[in-house]
Curated annotation (Swiss-Prot):
It is found in: Cytoplasm. Pfam families: GidB (PF02527). S-adenosyl-L-methionine binds at G95, L100, V146, E147, R159. The gene is rsmG. This is Ribosomal RNA small subunit methyltransferase G. The keyword Acetylation does not apply. Specifically methylates the N7 position of guanine in position 527 of 16S rRNA. Gene3D superfamilies: Vaccinia Virus protein VP39. Belongs to the methyltransferase superfamily. RNA methyltransferase RsmG family. The keyword Phosphoprotein does not apply. GO terms for molecular function: rRNA (guanine-N7-)-methyltransferase activity. Its EC number is 2.1.1.170. It is an enzyme of class 2 (transferase). Keywords: Cytoplasm, Methyltransferase, rRNA processing, S-adenosyl-L-methionine, Transferase.
Length: 226
């Protein structure tokens, strides 16, 4: 598979991963490039993303998603220190579309079981196809509305999906006890935070720097309040 997996893309990916402080194996680099190739190949058929240019796909999608991997890895590692927690973690990526960031999480965090849910059948089918092609047994595509999923998932993530109040309300029943939400946003969403109900708490906000992307990015970590 070599639609975009040429030397220049590999170099840009390696440089981006280094800038993010990400330690990736050769197999993971190959899987990420192959995923990018799949995304470009099937985008015309499935309409997975409005971004058509391969270079923009690398920056706006792949590196943007990779920026969230170090925070996720830290959370999973901290969770693993809890003797009561089961090994690894189950993650639900809501409104995953073409698998961003869900597929990237599955590649870079093999100890995490990732389910990507989307209401569009062909997008969920693409995730299943990507799982098979890339050899990711920890990746699953689900065609459903998130409100219908029971979980339990230790982390429920989204990227440019919906307002925080809607995201947390629609996915709350899928969250495991002591589970958390991970929301990827652009600018700090002060208004969205102010609109959250009293039983949802933002406990951490991380500013992200995406290599090659001159735009504000942040991650919000949220949890239910008893």
């Amino acid at each position: 598979m070599s639609v975009v997996s040429n030397t220049s893309f590999e170099h840009a990916l390696r440089e981006g991963a280094n800038a993010l402080g990400l330690d990736l194996s050769e197999a993971q680099i190959t899987q990420l490039l192959d995923f990018l190739a799949l995304l470009q190949k099937w985008n015309k058929v499935y309409n997975l993303t409005a971004v058509r240019d391969p270079q923009e796909m690398l920056t706006h999608h792949l590196l943007d998603s990779l920026a969230a991997v170090p925070p996720l890895r830290r959370h999973v590692a901290q969770r693993g220190q809890d003797s009561a927690a089961r090994p690894g973690a189950r993650l639900l990526d809501v409104g995953s579309g073409g698998g961003l960031p869900g597929v990237v999480f599955a590649i870079c965090c093999p100890e995490v079981d990732v389910s990507c849910v989307d209401t569009v059948a062909k997008k969920a089918a693409f995730i299943q196809q990507a799982a098979g092609t890339l050899g990711l047994s920890n990746l699953h595509g689900i065609h459903a509305r998130v409100e219908t999923l029971a979980g339990p998932f230790d982390v429920v993530s989204c990227r440019a999906f919906a307002a925080l109040a809607d995201f947390t309300a629609w996915s709350r029943q899928a969250l495991a006890p002591h589970g958390v939400w991970l929301a990827m946003k652009g600018k700090h969403p002060h208004d969205e935070i102010a609109a959250l109900p009293a039983d949802v708490s933002v406990f951490h906000v991380e500013q992200l720097t995406v290599p090659g992307l001159q735009a504000e990015r942040c991650i919000l970590w949220l949890r239910p309040v008893a």
